[in-house]
C-alpha cells in the first residue's frame, strides 16, 4: 500500500511539473503577440508562409472534431498570428460542465434499469425464507444478477469503444499533424530538432498507441469481466486476479507516461539548445563575414525564421485545440457513466445485496481507470506538441 501511495505521489509531482513545463513552452505564443497595431506582423510574409504550407490533413481533423461555435481554421490561424484568441474560456468550461451533466442525465435510463433489477433482487432476498429451500433464493438472485450483467456489459462495451476510438483518433491526428510541424521546424532553423524528432516521435506515438489499445485496454476489459464473475458467488474467488489485472494496467500506464514524457522533454531541450546555438552562430557568420550585404542578409534571414517560428507556434496551438477536442468528448462520456455506476451503487446499498453494490462500485472504478487512460495518452501527446511549439521560439533564436 505504501509503495502504491508513493507511486501516486510521484505521478502527482510529474503532472504538476509537466504543467509548468508546458506552460513555459506556450509562452512564445503570448510573447509573439503584438502589443499594438504598429507591431502587427507582416501580412504578406505570413500569407506567403501559409501558402507554402499544406494543412489540409489538420483542417480535416479540425472540421470533424472542433465545435460548431469555433471559427474556421484559416480564420483561427490568422487571429492567433495576430495575438488574438477567439475563444471564451469561461464558456468552454461551462460547455464541458454542462456536457458532463447532460451525459449523466442521458444515462438515467441505465440507473433506472439497474435500480429496478437491484430492488427486485433485494425483495427476493428478503422473501427467501418463504421459499422451500435456500437454493431457490439463490437462483432468483442469479437471475437478477445476470440481468444486471447484461446491462453492465452493454454499457461498458460502449465505453470501451469510445476509449478505443479516442485513442485511434489521437494517434491518427498525431501522425497527420507531425509532418507539418517538422516542415515548420526546418523553416524556423531547427534542422537538428526536426531530424531527431521525426523518427523518435513516429516511434513513440506508434508504440504508445499500439501498446495502450492492444495490451492495456484488453487487460482492463478482462479485469471487468472477472469482476462481474467474482460477485456472482462467494465460491468463485476471482477478486484478487481482477485487482491484479487492474493494477497491471495502472502501473503500465504510469510507466509509459514517465518514459514518454522523459524522452520527449529531454530530447526537446537538448535539440532546441543545439539549434539555438547553431542559428546564432550562422547569423553571426553571415553578419560579419559577408561583405556589404551581410548585415541586411542576416536580418532578412532572422525575419523569415522568426515568422516561420510564429506560424509554427500558431499551428501548434491549433493542434492542441484539436487534440483536446478529440479527447474531451469521449472522456466526458466515460466519466459520466462512471459517476452513474458509483451513484447507483450508493443508492441501492440499503436495499440490495452487497454483491450487487460491490459489483457496480468496482465497474465504476474500472471506468474511472479507462477515463484516466484516455486522458493520460492525451496528456502525453499534448506534451509532445508543446515541446515542438517551444523549440526555436522567436525569443529563443533572436
Describe these PLM feature segments:
Residues 2-118, 122-141, 155-165, 169-170, ...:
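Gly/Ser-rich, low-complexity
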Residues 120-124, 128, 225-229, 262-265, ...:
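Alpha-helical membrane-inserting segments
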Residues 132-141, 163-174, 200-211, 238-252, ...:
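Membrane-interface segments at loop-to-transmembrane junctions
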Residues 142-155, 174-191, 211-223, 228:
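Mid-bilayer segments of alpha-helical transmembrane spans in multi-pass integral membrane proteins
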Residues 197-322:
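Generic multipass alpha-helical transmembrane bundles of integral membrane proteins
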Residues 294-303, 340-398:
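Transmembrane alpha-helical segments and their short flanking loops
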Residues 313-354, 362:
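Helical hairpin unit composed of two closely spaced alpha helices linked by a short loop
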Amino acid at each position: 500500500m505504501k509503495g502504491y501511495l508513493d507511486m501516486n505521489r510521484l505521478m502527482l509531482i510529474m503532472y504538476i511539473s509537466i504543467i509548468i513545463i508546458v506552460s513555459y513552452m506556450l509562452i512564445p505564443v503570448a510573447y509573439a503577440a503584438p502589443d499594438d497595431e504598429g507591431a502587427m506582423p507582416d501580412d504578406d510574409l505570413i500569407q506567403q508562409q501559409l501558402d507554402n504550407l499544406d494543412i489540409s490533413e489538420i483542417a480535416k481533423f479540425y472540421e470533424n472534431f472542433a465545435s460548431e461555435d469555433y471559427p474556421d481554421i484559416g480564420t483561427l490561424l490568422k487571429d492567433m498570428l495576430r495575438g488574438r484568441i477567439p475563444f471564451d474560456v469561461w464558456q468552454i468550461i461551462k460547455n464541458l460542465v454542462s456536457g458532463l451533466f447532460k451525459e449523466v442525465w442521458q444515462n438515467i435510463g441505465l440507473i433506472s434499469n439497474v435500480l429496478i433489477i437491484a430492488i427486485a433482487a433485494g425483495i427476493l432476498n428478503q422473501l427467501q425464507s418463504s421459499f422451500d429451500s435456500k437454493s431457490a433464493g439463490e437462483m432468483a438472485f442469479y437471475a437478477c444478477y445476470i440481468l444486471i450483467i447484461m446491462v453492465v456489459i452493454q454499457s461498458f462495451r460502449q465505453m470501451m469503444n469510445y476509449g478505443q476510438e479516442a485513442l485511434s483518433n489521437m494517434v491518427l491526428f498525431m501522425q497527420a499533424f507531425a509532418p507539418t510541424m517538422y516542415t515548420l521546424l526546418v523553416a524556423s532553423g531547427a534542422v537538428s530538432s526536426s531530424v531527431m524528432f521525426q523518427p523518435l516521435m513516429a516511434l513513440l506515438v506508434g508504440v504508445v498507441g499500439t501498446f495502450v489499445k492492444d495490451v492495456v485496454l484488453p487487460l482492463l476489459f478482462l479485469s471487468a469481466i472477472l469482476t462481474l464473475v467474482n460477485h456472482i458467488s462467494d465460491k468463485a474467488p476471482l477478486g484478487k486476479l481482477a485487482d491484479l489485472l487492474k493494477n497491471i494496467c495502472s502501473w503500465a500506464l504510469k510507466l509509459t507516461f514517465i518514459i514518454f514524457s522523459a524522452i520527449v522533454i529531454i530530447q526537446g531541450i537538448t535539440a532546441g539548445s543545439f539549434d539555438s546555438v547553431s542559428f546564432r552562430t550562422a547569423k553571426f557568420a553571415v553578419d560579419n563575414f559577408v561583405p556589404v550585404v551581410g548585415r541586411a542578409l542576416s536580418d532578412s534571414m532572422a525575419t523569415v525564421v522568426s515568422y516561420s517560428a510564429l506560424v509554427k507556434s500558431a499551428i501548434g496551438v491549433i493542434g492542441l485545440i484539436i487534440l483536446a477536442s478529440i479527447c474531451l468528448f469521449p472522456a466526458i462520456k466515460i466519466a459520466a457513466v462512471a459517476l452513474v455506476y458509483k451513484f447507483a451503487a450508493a443508492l441501492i446499498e440499503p436495499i440490495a445485496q452487497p454483491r450487487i453494490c460491490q459489483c457496480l462500485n468496482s465497474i465504476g472504478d474500472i471506468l474511472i481507470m479507462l477515463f484516466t487512460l484516455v486522458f493520460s495518452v492525451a496528456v502525453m501527446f499534448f506534451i509532445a506538441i508543446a515541446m515542438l511549439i517551444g523549440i526555436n521560439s522567436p525569443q529563443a533564436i533572436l
